[in-house]
Amino acid sequence: MIAKRNLLFILLLTFAIFYSNAQQVIFGTNNFIEYQVGTLPLVISVPHGGNLDPSSIPNRICNNPVYTTDEFTIETALEIKNKLFELTGCYPHLIISHLKRSKLDPNRNLADGACGNSEAETAWNEFHGFITNGRNTANQQNNYKTFFVDLHGHGNPIQRIELGYLLYDSELALSDSTLNTQQYLNYSSIKNLVLNNVNNYTHAELLRGPYSFGTFLANNNFPSVPSQNIPFPGTTSNYFSGGYITANHTCYNIGAPINGLQMELNYNNIRNTPANRTVFALAFTQSIVSYFSTHFNVSLIGCSTLSTINDVLEKKIIIYPNPLVRGDIIHFKLPENIEYEYQILNTLGQIVDAGQLKHNQSIDSSKLFPGVFLIRLSNKNNNDLNIHKIIVQ
């Protein structure tokens, strides 16, 4: 009997993982560029973390190229993706260049980034084409309440995150009133957010106020500039304000209606070890969830269909929070006028709780010890069967 229960749990878990983890991945020519298609209103690009070194593409020599690899930025982005999925149930759009920077620099214009090599030019076009596709899809699915992050790593001696909004270090040192003028708003990669955020925060407040992205990161123990505590970087720190990608794939470019920034990660305590990457990825996830909630009034939790926090999510079944802490109340949003029978199964396939549920009901998780469980929801009237994986911490 126990063996049958184990088999049942394994089959259900396999189904649940396959169903929930399904993600389309598209590779460009020769697998140089990778696009992991997402459903979150978040697009992340990683241009400088690759290590492919094909002999068919000569090293770039045009216009004083930079060859430095942003070490472990791909690994960091993948860990961010995993943490976002754990917390929200959905993935961001993720675009990765696997070519070494000596072969391709997507953060330069085509001439300087590919130096006339046809293979590199194809990869450059695919990289930017995938970003365009990701942001267009995100905008269409989420009513332009979207965000873009171009992920890099810096080697500056000050171990802090540098957020580039296309404003120079000297410009960030200006007064709030000056930064709030139309002149500096037009320079900014978040100018659309300034014009349309639910709390009517000013440009300066969104750059370095208590609810800026830098401050959210700092509150999660990752000092960032600009932020409330570090409002500007100073003019001697070699601060990175943002490059070609940010200028062309955010609302600084009229043809790219998405807010965003370039994020330069320090090496120590973030990129240098798997454990540090995991800690940072969780902090980033918590920060971006807070950012969307604060400025877009959008909840990323239970995200298969996103909506504003104040609206009922237009999704057939939602279970939250997930992951949860033992003792939390498990909330269910179910279709109205339909009664479901539920069973909660542990890893042995044993039913640890069961009962009936209707729209907007909840159950106590006190019976659930830390671990992985499956919630099986069934409605005999219409042969509806739903299986959801939950994690109790």
Give the label of every model feature segment.
Residues M1-Q24, T308-I309:
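Bacterial Sec-dependent N-terminal signal peptides
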Residues Q23-C303:
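N-terminal catalytic or cofactor-binding beta/alpha core of small enzyme domains
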Residues N253-I254, I309-V312:
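Short, conserved catalytic or adaptor-binding loops enriched in Gly and charged residues
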Residues D311-Q393:
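C-terminal outer-membrane/trafficking sorting elements
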